[in-house]
A protein has these predicted regions:
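Active-site nucleotide-sugar/metal-binding loop of Leloir-type enzymes
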Residues: 68-79
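Conserved active-site beta-strand element of glycosyltransferases/polysaccharide synthases
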Residues: 108, 116, 156, 168, ...
Length: 245
């Protein structure tokens, strides 16, 4: 019992440090010196989200993500933005903030997902859990120079990198980025408003995820090690139930 509570205490301390760090001042990227073009991908039969008037973007719908990305011309588009099927609108100056980060050398960006529908206990609880994860595992991580977690949707990634590394629609983009040690930033001011909580596109395979820990540790890939640890931490609901018991 003492050992269990010791590990629980370590986890709580770890999460507390991330929570405090998430409120520190963030880096503001300077205005992009170049003009970029962005391809915005949304699933077929999904409504196109409302976007404030901005230049240099085009909407595309896709049924197969791998096929959709590989049909894009990398000579014309530098960035690809993958949105969830529940996205309804984007915040003002949305693309400008993404372009500023990309111009500074950031190849992968997790955007801030905000759930609009909060009617009822379940929807409100999902929205709260989403914001907790945003604060801890995205904003908190980046304050320590570690990569943000990637949700699999509502993200912006360098098109050339995606076309070179996305082998199929089942490829786990987040895992591939961590394995290649590509830094993932989080932009809390680039907001994607969603009608409901987006579905995570990857299966949660704890055993397979844990198997990457020691190889990543030996390689000194601290970003991936940190992500694996966070992947193994129970959800906020399970943590609350365990602590209350």
């Amino acid at each position: 019992d003492d050992l269990v509570f010791f590990f629980v205490g370590i986890v709580i301390l770890y999460l507390f440090v991330l929570a405090v760090a998430s409120h520190f001042k963030r880096i503001v990227y300077p205005k992009a010196e170049k003009k970029y073009h962005c391809a915005i991908l949304v699933p077929e039969e999904s409504p196109l989200p409302v976007i404030y008037r901005e230049e240099s973007y085009e909407f595309f719908t896709y049924n197969d993500l791998h096929q959709g990305i590989n049909t894009l011309d990398r000579e014309h588009y530098q960035l690809v933005l993958i949105l969830s099927n529940t996205a309804i609108s984007l915040s003002p100056l949305f693309l400008e903030k993404i372009y500023n980060a990309y111009d500074a050398g950031i190849q992968a960006i997790q955007l801030h997902t905000v759930i609009e529908n909060r009617k009822g206990f379940c929807n409100r609880f999902r929205a709260i859990c989403k914001e907790i994860k945003n604060s801890l595992f995205r904003a908190g991580n980046t304050q320590f120079g570690l990569s943000s977690n990637l949700s699999g949707t509502n993200m912006a990634i360098d098109l050339g990198w995606l076309q070179n590394n996305l082998r199929s629609s089942k490829t786990n983009i987040e895992r591939k980025l961590f394995q290649k040690n590509v830094y993932i930033d989080y932009l809390p001011d680039a907001i994607v408003y969603c009608q409901s909580s987006p579905v995570h596109p990857y299966r949660r395979r704890l055993r397979k995820t844990a198997s990457y820990f020691f190889p990543s540790l030996l390689e000194g890939n601290w970003n991936f090690c940190n992500r694996i640890v966070q992947h193994l931490i129970p959800s906020p609901l399970k943590m609350c139930i365990f602590v209350s018991v």
